[in-house]
């Protein structure tokens, strides 16, 4: 047992003091007095930190009290039905309702909304710069300059991409590692379609990799889903949708992704 747990060891061997419950009750009762004394006596940074902590505690306590009060509150509409029609979002309030069920429905809607933005791979392994970039030596005779980097991972460049002059190009993206299409799987339909990549939305490794269009595991890409014939609620054809890469493209030689629906 660690040396600093001698009190716990003593309690296990001999039991607690006979007045343990009484002392605990008195300590809890004195807590409010101690908090008041600390709030009045602390000065400087210590006072600011203490005030911030108490502020957060009070907010949490008020939330708990409000949730407890709203738990079983019932509301009922007037007995006489109104002649004016009600909109859809007010129809569920015409009969006696329970506030608890209403609040749980709101929470479920929020959870569904949060699930829309959840991704298949929430965490990915970090990639070091040594693995991502290969140093390219330059210099006419000595080859002493080493400011250029060659990207060793697959990349995506748009159709309107033009290389900078070789003399000023810092990051080199090899032609053999450029991908234009991805094998996208629809999670609900269970079909895999090869779709053209529109852009790289976010690379989890670094914003610089997003700017360079590097395709690594966990990267969010935008793909052209017009071939799938998906439409919005208003009837418009969906053009681009996000997908997350699920494989190591440099090992497999292709880009596999799951559509975010």
UniProtKB/Swiss-Prot annotation:
Residues 28-90 are annotated as: Disordered. Component of the pre-66S ribosomal particle. Interacts with NOP7 and RRP1. Interacts with RSA4 (via WD repeats). This is Ribosome biogenesis protein NSA2. InterPro entries: NSA2_fam, Ribosomal_Se8/biogenesis_NSA2. It comes from Ajellomyces capsulatus (strain NAm1 / WU24). One of its GO terms (cellular component) is nucleolus. The keyword Plastid does not apply. The gene is NSA2. CDD domains: NSA2. Residues 28-37, 57-73 have a biased composition (Basic and acidic residues). The lineage of its organism: Eukaryota, Fungi, Dikarya, Ascomycota, Pezizomycotina.
């Amino acid at each position: 047992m660690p040396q600093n747990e001698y009190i716990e060891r003593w309690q296990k061997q001999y039991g607690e003091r006979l007045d343990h419950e009484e002392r605990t009750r008195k300590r809890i009762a004195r807590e409010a007095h101690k908090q008041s004394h600390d709030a009045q006596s602390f000065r400087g940074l210590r006072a600011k930190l203490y005030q911030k902590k108490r502020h957060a505690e009070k907010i949490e306590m008020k939330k708990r009290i409000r949730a407890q009060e709203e738990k079983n509150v019932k509301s009922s509409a007037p007995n006489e039905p109104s002649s004016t029609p009600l909109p859809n979002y007010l129809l569920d309030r015409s009969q006696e309702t329970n506030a608890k069920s209403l609040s749980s429905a709101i929470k479920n809607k929020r959870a569904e909304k949060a699930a829309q933005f959840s991704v298949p791979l929430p965490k990915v392994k970090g990639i070091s710069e040594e693995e991502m970039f290969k140093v390219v030596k330059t210099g006419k005779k000595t080859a002493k300059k080493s400011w250029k980097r060659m990207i060793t991972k697959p990349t995506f460049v748009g159709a309107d991409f033009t290389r900078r002059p070789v003399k000023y190009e810092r990051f080199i993206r090899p032609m053999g590692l450029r991908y234009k299409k991805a094998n996208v799987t629809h999670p609900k339909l269970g079909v895999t379609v090869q779709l053209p990549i529109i852009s790289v939305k976010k690379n989890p490794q670094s914003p610089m990799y997003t700017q360079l269009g590097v395709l690594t595991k966990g990267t969010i890409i935008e793909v052209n889903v017009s071939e799938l014939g998906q439409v919005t609620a208003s009837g418009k054809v969906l053009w681009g949708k996000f997908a997350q890469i699920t494989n190591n493209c440099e090992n497999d030689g292709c880009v596999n992704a799951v559509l975010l629906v």
